[in-house]
């Protein structure tokens, strides 16, 4: 099965590609001249300027930061995928903030739910999700069996991952999110956008995050981006065979 792996920035894509090298072969595909060119000579550029790397069964996309950019980039790549060699799975991947103590710096989180944590409306009684407002969905659920296998293979925490448009930077906001989502493992900025695009194309979605910082008061000196990127590469080294062998939703 081919999978599209969507990252926000080049450093994340490079880590995923590093983890997937040497390539996990597509089980039903014999590489031809075009495939070899893509595997051996860096990324291609899609319409819209999106960079995409091919590694065996996987295409790794740099879509941009935030849910809107992630949705636009993902939708572009999915629309351009040629049938019958299209994608069977979409994965949102990158670094993010971890909710202490469950997800410490350097650990991985695999989403069992992808949650739009700040898409909705504020009211005197509290926050209302878009689902509660009647305007759509606020949660996407990855295939449970695949998410569990991914977490087991990588040693990741299996927990909800929150998508936010503004990274949490205060204790008050941390407490608010933790109260609304007590089981959350991580927050990031792209997962829900990727999931919306995947759903529009009828495809399942997974999210994998490597923790670079604790969700809480903003402290750049405490961030460990390099450590998180290494964890992301290590995670995809273990995850590649799981994704390549997955047969789709049962």
Predicted segments, located by residue:
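N-terminal short beta-loop-beta anion/metal-coordinating cradle
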Residues: 1-73, 80
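Structural motif
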Residues: 2-4, 88-91
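Hydrophobic/aromatic beta-strand patches that form the interior of the parallel beta-sheet core
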Residues: 61, 91, 109, 157-162, ...
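Glycine-rich phosphate-binding loop signature in dinucleotide/nucleotide-binding domains
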Residues: 80-88, 201-203
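Mid-sequence, gly/pro-rich, charge-dense loop/helix-turn segments that line enzyme active sites
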Residues: 99-181
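A C-terminal functional module that forms or caps the active site or interfaces directly
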Residues: 166-207, 212-218
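His/Asp/Glu-rich mid-to-C-terminal helical/loop segments that flank catalytic regions of hydrolases
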Residues: 215-250
